[in-house]
């Protein structure tokens, strides 16, 4: 009798644990630039306030950085780290690939999707591989309409409250950055080696991208998506920023479209079971 009761209690505990198990989802999104409209009356000359950058998760930055590192390993000169001192001492051109380097800022235009290895787990939030996308046909549809896709990505994530859910940092499109300036100073130590003789200091403005912003997805009975995306564009000699800010309640499995005079977003949140 005790054995039967113990088994019943164990079964109840397993059932309770299963009922309260954390659900996982995957989101896929495409962001694209809208066609210029000469009838547009909205004024984007006022620069929007900086976004609240709390609880940030830089999935895309890490993914694009891995993409740049792979290009370096494949022999791309743009992404190779030049070893100036080794070149002087050996008389030969030398370069290396450092997995800890910042390869993202070496892109003039970011790829449409970051290159990541396909994963299947529920350990932490991670990016989708291109083979796990469902929206490839929509990219072609946008291009046929003359629209320019800036980013096609997705990630898997557990259900979290509004307070705990991270803000996923979004970057895409071409780079907007001021040119670098350099100053060279000679070290005072007369016994310095060649590699330490000169101190080259780089003064560089922060790199910005055509598409930047944050997306947060949290669960409270329903799925809620908070979208704050900035699109930079050229207006004569000026660079303007148009912001899309939307808060949307969505259902898993439905395809949703966020509209803005300068920017469009298509996304779908799907249930994920490993």
Feature map (PLM): residue ranges:
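Generic hydrophobic segment detector
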Residues: 1, 74-80, 94, 263-274
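Bacterial N-terminal signal peptides that target proteins for export
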Residues: 1-7
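Feature for long, exposed domains in two main contexts
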Residues: 9-10, 267
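N-terminal signal peptide c-region/cleavage motif recognized by signal peptidases
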Residues: 14-18
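Extended, low-hydrophobicity segments enriched in charged/polar residues
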Residues: 21-242
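A cross-kingdom marker for long, charged
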Residues: 246-274
């Amino acid at each position: 009798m005790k054995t039967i009761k113990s088994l019943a209690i164990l079964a109840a505990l397993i059932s309770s644990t299963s009922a309260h198990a954390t659900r996982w989802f995957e989101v896929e999104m495409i962001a694209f630039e809208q066609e210029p409209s000469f009838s547009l009356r909205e004024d984007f000359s006022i620069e929007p306030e900086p976004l609240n950058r709390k609880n940030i998760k830089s999935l895309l930055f890490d993914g694009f950085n891995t993409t740049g590192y792979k290009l370096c390993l494949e022999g791309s000169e743009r992404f190779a780290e030049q070893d100036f001192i080794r070149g002087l001492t050996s008389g030969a051109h030398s370069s290396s690939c450092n997995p800890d380097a910042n390869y993202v800022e070496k892109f003039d235009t970011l790829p449409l999707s970051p290159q990541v290895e396909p994963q299947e787990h529920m350990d932490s939030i991670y990016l989708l591989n291109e083979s796990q996308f469902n929206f490839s046909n929509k990219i072609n549809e946008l291009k046929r309409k003359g629209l320019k896709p800036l980013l096609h990505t997705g990630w898997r994530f557990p259900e979290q409250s509004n307070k705990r859910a991270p803000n996923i940092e979004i970057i895409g499109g071409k780079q907007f950055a001021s040119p670098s300036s350099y100053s060279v100073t000679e070290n005072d130590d007369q016994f310095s080696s060649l590699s330490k003789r000169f101190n080259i200091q780089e003064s560089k403005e922060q790199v910005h991208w055509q598409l930047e912003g944050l997306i947060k997805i949290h669960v409270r009975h329903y799925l809620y998506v908070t979208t704050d995306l900035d699109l930079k564009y050229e207006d004569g000699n000026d660079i303007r920023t148009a912001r899309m800010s939307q808060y949307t309640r969505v259902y898993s499995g439905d395809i949703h479209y966020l509209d803005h005079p300068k920017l469009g977003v298509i996304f779908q949140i799907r249930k994920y079971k490993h």
